[in-house]
Amino acid sequence: MAAAAVVAATVPAQSMGADGASSVHWFRKGLRLHDNPALLAAVRGARCVRCVYILDPWFAASSSVGINRWRFLLQSLEDLDTSLRKLNSRLFVVRGQPADVFPRLFKEWGVTRLTFEYDSEPFGKERDAAIMKMAKEAGVEVVTENSHTLYDLDRIIELNGQKPPLTYKRFQALISRMELPKKPAVAVSSQQMESCRAEIQENHDDTYGVPSLEELGFPTEGLGPAVWQGGETEALARLDKHLERKAWVANYERPRMNANSLLASPTGLSPYLRFGCLSCRLFYYRLWDLYKKVKRNSTPPLSLFGQLLWREFFYTAATNNPRFDRMEGNPICIQIPWDRNPEALAKWAEGKTGFPWIDAIMTQLRQEGWIHHLARHAVACFLTRGDLWVSWESGVRVFDELLLDADFSVNAGSWMWLSCSAFFQQFFHCYCPVGFGRRTDPSGDYIRRYLPKLKGFPSRYIYEPWNAPESVQKAAKCIIGVDYPRPIVNHAETSRLNIERMKQIYQQLSRYRGLCLLASVPSCVEDLSHPVAEPGSSQAGSISNTGPRALSSGPASPKRKLEAAEEPPGEELTKRARVTEMPTQEPASKDS
């Protein structure tokens, strides 16, 4: 399906009425009034417009999505309703499933036009095809518009010979041949809405109001205040703060990573882009305009939009792949024989691995719904190829539950990338769960913030408290193995073993042999041996915080040769020799 389309159903002339269409705009993502071309299409020539969000209470009660993400969504809906009130309209939150809800609404409201934002993800495309078929049978015109991505993803795939690009370099080459993204559409005005105002009943809030967390079955006792406030209003305020960083835009200054980088920033944007509270096109062109202003009309380089483009890259890779979030049946995923270790997975997810750096990150994620993109790299590497050798699919599910900005494409794509299962990552780079944190925050304040039981440890021992003398542990009132778990693995031994495992797997992928990927693989490389230069976009509003970045370690990598090579076809990637599993490293301790 094209990214923007009109499905012209056979609409009886009398149903349109002399005064125009009876429109319903269906909000899903795209929870905003700015740059919403599908909403403008609903208003155009209409006598009546209703804005609808369909929420299934049963799904809320049964899904694995965590409370922080539901709270962010409900806040975003409240904000949207508030904005619509200012236009003398309201948001209709309809309970149920789209396939059940729309036939009733079409009949009850006399709907003649349905509009919504195009969804590029496989599940969304399948759902929308069914709704469009239903609308056509009911004589309802359907209008869809693309505004969740910068580019027409189908066009990118077409330019690449009808297959998605599997390297970021190739993706950049393709979009450099395309026209610039469309400019953001103007926001709907009060004058436009006034001419097509729908009747609002006195009991609107009872029937169509935004539900509370309690109504959806979430216990809120002990729930802390939201670190990230949902909604378009907050998103636009954050965008303004983000763009105040003119020095970065002008000079490519990359602030060095430090403890403050790990905390939620008032300019962070990733959850707002995920829910569509902020338009990616508005952000793109605000950055573009600012760059031209401070650089005196110079054309911005693609790298200025790096985090946005990584998001686009993963959307392109996923759009025609319904198995993108799993190994089996996924044509781009290397079939690595991961271990089944539910105990290790649970300790990782609950922040009980015995490595304070990893546990603090997972605690922040569970409490706040967000972690810095390099923190994501650290915990993803630890779960998969670095230490626990657990499938990236398990990581996807945990992040999908806890992470505010998790979506199908970017979440799964990032996990495949970080676990070396796709997109040609350098498997011999390994994040040290002690050294990386210590270099980032030598004082250990981040650890003390999220693991207060360790706050009494001096900085010397806080990243590896198991090495602290007994007297230090007693003084800190935290005995390792009693009050805080011992390390779940011996990192030095396990990481070497896992690099060897990965080396075996890549050796069996004959496609790589001629590319010298294994020419000189050290037994273990602790990545990021120098302080990290943080991408400018991350703390100034981390766009797609899971987005990959160049890893800095040692001499030029053979990955460069790999990127220059022709991409392997999807069919060949499915023919993976399964490697005989090597003996699993015994956990150093089973303390919980």
UniProtKB/Swiss-Prot annotation:
Q: Taxonomic lineage per UniProt?
A: Eukaryota, Metazoa, Chordata, Craniata, Vertebrata
Q: Which residues cross the membrane?
A: none
Q: Name one GO biological process term.
A: negative regulation of glucocorticoid secretion
Task: Give the species this sequence originates from.
Answer: Mus musculus (Mouse)
- The protein's name is Cryptochrome-2
Induction pattern: Shows no clear circadian oscillation pattern in testis, cerebellum nor liver. In skeletal muscle, under constant darkness and 12 hours light:12 hours dark conditions, levels peak between ZT6 and ZT9.
Domain of life of the native organism: Eukaryota
Regulation (activators, inhibitors): KL001 (N-[3-(9H-carbazol-9-yl)-2-hydroxypropyl]-N-(2-furanylmethyl)-methanesulfonamide) binds to CRY1 and stabilizes it by inhibiting FBXL3- and ubiquitin-dependent degradation of CRY1 resulting in lengthening of the circadian periods. KL001-mediated CRY1 stabilization can inhibit glucagon-induced gluconeogenesis in primary hepatocytes.
What does the protein in this record do?
Transcriptional repressor which forms a core component of the circadian clock. The circadian clock, an internal time-keeping system, regulates various physiological processes through the generation of approximately 24 hour circadian rhythms in gene expression, which are translated into rhythms in metabolism and behavior. It is derived from the Latin roots 'circa' (about) and 'diem' (day) and acts as an important regulator of a wide array of physiological functions including metabolism, sleep, body temperature, blood pressure, endocrine, immune, cardiovascular, and renal function.
Which residues are noted in the entry as FAD-binding? S270, Q307, H373, D405, A406, D407
State if Transport is listed as a keyword: no
Outcome of mutating R376A: Impairs protein folding. Abolishes binding of BMAL1, PER1 and FBXL3. Strongly reduces SKP1 binding
Predominant location: cytoplasm
Task: Identify the PROSITE patterns for this entry.
Answer: PHR_CRY_ALPHA_BETA
